[in-house]
Design a protein with these regions (language model features):
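Bacterial Sec-dependent N-terminal signal peptides
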Residues: 1-24
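Mature catalytic domains of secreted/periplasmic carbohydrate-active enzymes
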Residues: 22-190
């Protein structure tokens, strides 16, 4: 009887070990990482484009309401003034390329939750919630590719406008994660 239990246990272990191995993430070696990042060592200069509704009134991006320098409603009212009427991604990329930069990174969504494209996960985006009424990210990405530059996309996981994100401002929270872990999990799935 004991032998049967041991054999059965070993058989189960052998059968499931292949499943676990298939789901394991292969760790990148230092050599693989160096090869993947080689371009970055040679790039020397990159331009980070930090652009969003905060450009309307020239406030210090979404930290201005988070740090309570101005009320959230006043900060978000910039959506109605964010027309992007002078937005010219070709001119931006001409300038970035002329500067000698080899890559650029753009903020696709900052902590305020406003996305520069029509995301299906939120109506808080430049197409549905701003005066621009259009996708501002795709034209930028297309120009980066035309100019032969590397591209980075900055996407903030923090989203102070999302009702399920616990922290609202520096001093205000919507809820305590310990008291409502289901709500936190709901945000994480967002």
């Amino acid at each position: 009887m004991k032998l049967k239990q041991i054999l059965c246990s070993l058989l189960c272990l052998a059968a499931t070990s292949g499943v676990v191995a298939q789901n394991a993430v292969q760790a990148e070696t230092e050599e693989q990482k160096d090869k993947r990042m080689e371009w970055f060592d040679h790039a020397k200069l990159g331009i980070f484009v930090h652009w969003g509704i905060y450009a309307v009134n020239g406030v210090s991006e979404s930290w201005s309401f988070h740090n309570k320098y101005l009320p959230y409603e006043q900060y978000m009212s910039q959506c109605s003034g964010f027309t992007a009427s002078k937005y010219d991604p070709k001119a931006w990329l001409d300038l970035i390329k002329e500067s000698g930069a080899r890559y650029t990174v753009i903020t696709t969504k900052h902590h305020d939750g406003v996305a520069l494209w029509d995301t299906k996960y939120s109506d808080l985006n430049t197409v549905k919630a701003t005066a621009a009424k259009r996708d501002l990210l795709t034209p930028f990405v297309k120009e980066v590719r035309k100019h032969g530059l590397k591209l980075g996309l900055y996407y903030s996981l923090i989203d102070w406008s999302h009702p399920d994100y616990p922290n609202f401002t520096r001093t205000e929270t919507r809820y305590d994660v310990k008291d409502d872990p289901a709500r936190w999990q709901k945000f994480l799935k967002f």
